[in-house]
Amino acid sequence: MTLTDCDLRRVRVSNGGRHARSGARRLPGARDASTSVWVVSDVLQPLVDLPGVREAADRARDALAEVHMHKANRRGWPTTAAEAAVRAARSSAAIDGGATELPADGRVADPVLAGALRVGQALDGDALRNMVGVWQRAPLQALARLHLLAAADLVADEIELGRPRADAGVAQRLDLLAQTVLTSDAPAPVLAAVVHGELMTLRPFGSADGVVARAASRLVAVSSGLDPHSLGVPEVFWLRRRQAYLDAASGFAAGTADGVGGWVVFCCGALEDGAREARSIADAAG
């Protein structure tokens, strides 16, 4: 799904005796009803109860909270956050096959890297504050903006920028994802993983979807207070383990309990590792 029209799908989980209930909403990650988890009130609560998820989310939260207390981040966080945004953009571009080198003259020729850097600028400083405001009111508008920035050099027709594909089900799944973003009380690392995974699965725009998905995960982290200054760099973890990242995303898309839970734990691990990357930035800043 994405942040607008989603068709949250059921994931049947034998989890502490939970059973399917008539009229239950369906959870993100499952491709069909025979491989899905059943949701009661908060659509994401069953995910929190999957093995290892709650503990992984707690570790991610604690690691990010700790790095925010680093002496370099107490007042100098705008500097460290700016460096984090650049590292995140370069790593996100590389995951999708883009270049990572920043030319000395500042002219970035690679379209994937150029788009990722534009997204990084939108997730830094005053621009981030504005983007978070949009995300909290209208997640789909924020997604459209992210795609416009990420794919500006990738599409032949500008009319495609910010517009989800017209394929059946895309709008519905985006809508359900958006409602989940606005209403779920799930731990922020879990919500970030679901938003990320659903966008990777749906590929709603047909271009730059990976960059958009990872940026949306960052928006969840910032807007929820998990990583309020956007100091973490989980993208480095995903790049270093690119094949494992892609395999975990495929597991999420399959919708099995193991696949969905494995993806969430993997993403929580990336957030925890991203806090270590943030610490290295802060240490270098003094």
Language-model regions, residue ranges each:
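FIC/Doc superfamily catalytic core
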Residues: 2-286
